[in-house]
From Swiss-Prot:
Subunit structure: Monomer.
Protein name in the entry: Snake venom metalloproteinase jararafibrase-4
Organism: Bothrops jararaca
SUPFAM superfamilies linked: Metalloproteases ('zincins'), catalytic domain (SSF55486)
Recorded coiled-coil stretches: none
Domain Peptidase M12B, first and last residues per copy: 6-47
Length: 47
């Protein structure tokens, strides 16, 4: 319910290592980060 909603601030940083891992392909990096956020969202949905 809306009165029980909680929010967190989330900051994600792509470091040079991850940038190099995906050969600077920002679409692949965005996809990976988006998947991470979805997993975290599902994990925190029940707390």
């Amino acid at each position: 319910t809306p009165e029980h909603q909680r929010y967190i601030e989330l900051f994600l940083v792509v470091d040079h290592g991850m940038f190099m891992k995906y050969n600077g392909n920002s679409d692949k990096i965005y996809y990976y980060i988006h998947q991470m956020v979805n997993i975290m969202k599902x994990a925190y949905x029940y707390l």
